[in-house]
Amino acid sequence: GEKIYPSTGDLAIQYKKLGGKTHIIGKPGIEIFNFAYNKASVSREKVLMIGDSLFNDIYGANQFKIDSLLVTSGIHKEFFISNKDPLEIIDNIHSDYQNTGIPNYIMEKLK
């Protein structure tokens, strides 16, 4: 879709800043990757994390040591509108944030 909404992780971060206690089981946490991997019964070499978030999807895949594909038409799309080299754009995003991953593959959309 065209609209981008805050993720549950964003809401948890805000809640924690207000003094609330959180326990996140989701990307980029290793628990969710372990859960999915244990259900799959395949080697890590056959797993590909597809996502639009350098912070959650790609970083999580990097931590779990699986390949990843970044879809640039998602939450970071405003950065990828330019005709710059995608890796240069990712470096610029990395300079502004912690916990960002490096994708193995990049494409605009899944078709």
Say what each PLM segment does:
Residues 1-111:
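Asp-based, Mg2+/Mn2+-dependent phosphohydrolase catalytic module
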